[in-house]
Amino acid sequence: MKMSVTFLLILMILPLFTGEWQSGSRLSALKKRLLEKRLLQKRFCTEIGKDCGTSWECCEDCCIHGTCSHESNCANFKLR
């Protein structure tokens, strides 16, 4: 039992020392997923003047009082 646990630990730790398991590749995969999500969101976003629940739903920058608004209106709204 101890041998199998030790063997599994070695298999998990060994790539860290050999450089096969690089955090950079994991980060680039995460960035790629976030970019795909952002592009998908832009493709299926809510137009200006339509109802919205959050700013993520809007094609532009923000959702003010349940309506998608243009970026310039968002800046004015945030200043108030």
Swiss-Prot record:
Annotated tissue distribution: Expressed by the venom duct.
Domain of life (superkingdom): Eukaryota
Disulphide linkage map: 45-59, 52-63, 58-68, 62-74
GO cellular component, one term: extracellular region
Entry annotated with the keyword Disulfide bond: yes
UniProt propeptide residues: 20-41
Keyword Metal-binding belongs to the record: no
Signal sequence interval, chain numbering: 1-19
Xref: PROSITE patterns: I_CONOTOXIN
InterPro entries noted in UniProt: Conotoxin-I_CS
Localization, UniProt: Secreted
Main location: secreted
Keywords from the named record: Cleavage on pair of basic residues, Disulfide bond, Neurotoxin, Secreted, Signal, Toxin
GO MF annotations in UniProt: toxin activity
UniProt family annotation: Belongs to the conotoxin I1 superfamily.
UniProt note: domains: The cysteine framework is XI (C-C-CC-CC-C-C).
Protein name according to UniProt: Conotoxin Cl11.2
